[in-house]
C-alpha cells in the first residue's frame, strides 16, 4: 500500500505552501489570542481598539459584498461581523471562504477537468423531444464539465444493504482497478467486508485507489483498521485534507462524495457511506433510510472523472483515464448525467439543477432530504410550484442526527406550507436519502443535501436520470416512505411553543454559517 502525496517535482512548491500556511496560521492564531485577551481582560473598552475593530469590520463587510456568493451567506456574515466585529472578522477569515478556493488552485483543477471531459451530442436530441429535459441537462452541462449520456443502464436500490451486497460482488469481479471515494468509513461489518474483498483483489494484482475524508471518518475509524487498510497490496490511499495543527481554512471544503468505480464499467453513487448504520447493521436514530444507484455503460466515465478530480487535487497525480468510446451496442433506456460539484466551481451546478427541477415540475415535485436549510430563492421556486398547482411534497427526518440543524429545518416549514406544499417527517427514524423526483420523467439521486454546506462548501456528486425505469422506482420508494411518515400541517406548525418559534428565528440568522 502506498499513501499518496505530492510528486517530487512539486516538493519545493509544497514546502513554500506549507511555510505560507504556517505563517498565515500564526497570524490567525495571534488574532484569536488577541480576541480572547479582549474578552478576558476587558480591554475592548479602550476607545481606539473599538474604533479599529469596527472600521475593520466595515471594511471586511464591504469586501464581502464584492464577492459573487450566495446572498443569504453574505447577510449572515454581515450580521455576525457588525454585531461582534473582532470575533466576526477572526471567524470570517478562518471559516468564511464560501466557494473562495484560491484562484490558481481552482484554475488548475478546472483545467484538468477540461482536458478530461467528454462533450457529446446526446443533449441535442432533447431540444425537440423534451425541451424541459434539455433545460435540466443544460443547467448542469453549461455550469460544469459534465455531459449527458445514453447507452447507460441504471439500477436503483431503495435498500442500501442490497446495494452493498451487489457492490461487493462487482468488486470481487474486478480485473483491472477499483476506485473508492467516501466521506465516512467507519469500523464495523460494512467496512470489514469491503476490506476483505480488497485484500483478495489486491493480491490478484488489481490496482486499488481509495479516498476517504479525514474529518468525516475521524471519530469512527480505529488505528488498527487504518493499519489493516495500509497492509493491502496494490492499494494507494489518499486521506482527503487531513486535520493538523496548522489552521486551514480549507477545513470547510470536505469531500462529501460517495463513489465506487470498477474497471470503468460499473459505478455506484448515492447517499450511503461505508458504515453499519446505512445497512441496518447498527441502529442510529431509528431506521436509517437511504438509497443508491448502480450505473453501467457510457455514464460510468463521469464517475471516474469525478474520482480523478479529487485524486488530482489531493495528490498532484493525473490518473490515466481510459479513452472514452461510446458503446452504441450497450442497452439503455433514457438519459443519465452524473456530475460533480464543489468549491472549485463557482457556477454551482447542483444548485442550478435543483432550481431547474423545481421549475420543470408540472404535476408533482417530490424532495427527500435530511436537512432543509435553503435560501430565499430556492424557497420562492418551491412556493411558485405549489401555488401553480404542482403536488409539492418534502420528506425530512423525524428523528434527527443533529438537533440544532433539525430545529433550523423545521423553521423553514412555514413558507412552504403556506404556499400549499406538504411536509412529511419520516416517523420510523432518520431520512438520509437525497432525491428529487418530478412528473415520472426526471429524478436526482446523490450526495447533495438541501443546505448551505452541501451547496456552497462541500465536494458533492449526483446523477440526473431522465426517461428511465429508475425514475418510477424512485417515485414508488418516496411514496412508500411518505406512507410511513407524519404530515406536518400548517396548523400544527403554527401551534408550536413560543420559545421554539423564537429559537428558530434566531437560528435562521446564522443558518448559512453552519
Language-model features: locations:
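N-terminal localization/anchoring segments of enzymes in phospholipid and broader phosphate metabolism
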Residues: 1-352, 356, 360, 400, ...
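Helical hairpin unit composed of two closely spaced alpha helices linked by a short loop
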Residues: 371-392, 397, 402
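Histidine/acidic-residue-rich catalytic or RNA/ligand-binding cores of hydrolases
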Residues: 377-379, 406-408, 438
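Conserved acidic, small-residue-rich alpha-beta core segments centered on
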Residues: 408, 445-446
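Active-site donor-binding acidic/aromatic loop of nucleotide-activated sugar
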Residues: 423-427
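Catalytic-core elements of nucleic-acid end-processing and repair enzymes
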Residues: 434
Amino acid at each position: 500500500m502506498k499513501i499518496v502525496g505530492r510528486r517530487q517535482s512539486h516538493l519545493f512548491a509544497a514546502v513554500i505552501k506549507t511555510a505560507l500556511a504556517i505563517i498565515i496560521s500564526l497570524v490567525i492564531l495571534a488574532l484569536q489570542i488577541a480576541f480572547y485577551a479582549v474578552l478576558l481582560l476587558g480591554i475592548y473598552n479602550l476607545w481606539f481598539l473599538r474604533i479599529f475593530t469596527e472600521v475593520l469590520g466595515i471594511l471586511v463587510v464591504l469586501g464581502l459584498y464584492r464577492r459573487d456568493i450566495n446572498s443569504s451567506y453574505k447577510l449572515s456574515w454581515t450580521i455576525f461581523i457588525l454585531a461582534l466585529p473582532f470575533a466576526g472578522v477572526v471567524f470570517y477569515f478562518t471559516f468564511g471562504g464560501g466557494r473562495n478556493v484560491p484562484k490558481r488552485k481552482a484554475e488548475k483543477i478546472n483545467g484538468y477537468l477540461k482536458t478530461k471531459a467528454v462533450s457529446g451530442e446526446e443533449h441535442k436530441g432533447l431540444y425537440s423531444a423534451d425541451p424541459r429535459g434539455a433545460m435540466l441537462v443544460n443547467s448542469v452541462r453549461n455550469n460544469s464539465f459534465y455531459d449527458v449520456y445514453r447507452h447507460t443502464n441504471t439500477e436503483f436500490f431503495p435498500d442500501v444493504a442490497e446495494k452493498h451486497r451487489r457492490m461487493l460482488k462487482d468488486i470481487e469481479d474486478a480485473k483491472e482497478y477499483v476506485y473508492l471515494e467516501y466521506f465516512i468509513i467507519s469500523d464495523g461489518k460494512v467496512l470489514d467486508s469491503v476490506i476483505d474483498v480488497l485484500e483478495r483483489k489486491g493480491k490478484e494484482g488489481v490496482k486499488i485507489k481509495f479516498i476517504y475524508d479525514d474529518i468525516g471518518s475521524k471519530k469512527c475509524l480505529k488505528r488498527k483498521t487504518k493499519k489493516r487498510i495500509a497492509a493491502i497490496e496494490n492499494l494507494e490511499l489518499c486521506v482527503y485534507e487531513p486535520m493538523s495543527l496548522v489552521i486551514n481554512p480549507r477545513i470547510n471544503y470536505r469531500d462529501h462524495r460517495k463513489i465506487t468505480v470498477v474497471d470503468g464499467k460499473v459505478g455506484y453513487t448515492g447517499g450511503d457511506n461505508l458504515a453499519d448504520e446505512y445497512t441496518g447493521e447498527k441502529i442510529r436514530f431509528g431506521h436509517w433510510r437511504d438509497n443508491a444507484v448502480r450505473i453501467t455503460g457510457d455514464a460510468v466515465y463521469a464517475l471516474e472523472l469525478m474520482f480523478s478530480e479529487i485524486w488530482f487535487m489531493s495528490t498532484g497525480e493525473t490518473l490515466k483515464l481510459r479513452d472514452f468510446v461510446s458503446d452504441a451496442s450497450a442497452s439503455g433506456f433514457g438519459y443519465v448525467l452524473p456530475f460533480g460539484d464543489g468549491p472549485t466551481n463557482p457556477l454551482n451546478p447542483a444548485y442550478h439543477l435543483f432550481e431547474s427541477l423545481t421549475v420543470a415540475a408540472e404535476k408533482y415535485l417530490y424532495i427527500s432530504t435530511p436537512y432543509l436549510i435553503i435560501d430565499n430563492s430556492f424557497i420562492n421556486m418551491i412556493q411558485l410550484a405549489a401555488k401553480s398547482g404542482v403536488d409539492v411534497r418534502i420528506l425530512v427526518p423525524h428523528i434527527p442526527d443533529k438537533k440544532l440543524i433539525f430545529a433550523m429545518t423545521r423553521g423553514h416549514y412555514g413558507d412552504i406550507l403556506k404556499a400549499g406544499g406538504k411536509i412529511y417527517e419520516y416517523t420510523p427514524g432518520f431520512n438520509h436519502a437525497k432525491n428529487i423526483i418530478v412528473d415520472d420523467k426526471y429524478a436526482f439521486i446523490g450526495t447533495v443535501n438541501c443546505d448551505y454546506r452541501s451547496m456552497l462548501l462541500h465536494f458533492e456528486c449526483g446523477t440526473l436520470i431522465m426517461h428511465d425505469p429508475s425514475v418510477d422506482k424512485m417515485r414508488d420508494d418516496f411514496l412508500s416512505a411518505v406512507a410511513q411518515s407524519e404530515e406536518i400541517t400548517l396548523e400544527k406548525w403554527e401551534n408550536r411553543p413560543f420559545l421554539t418559534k423564537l429559537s428558530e428565528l434566531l437560528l435562521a440568522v446564522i443558518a448559512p454559517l453552519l
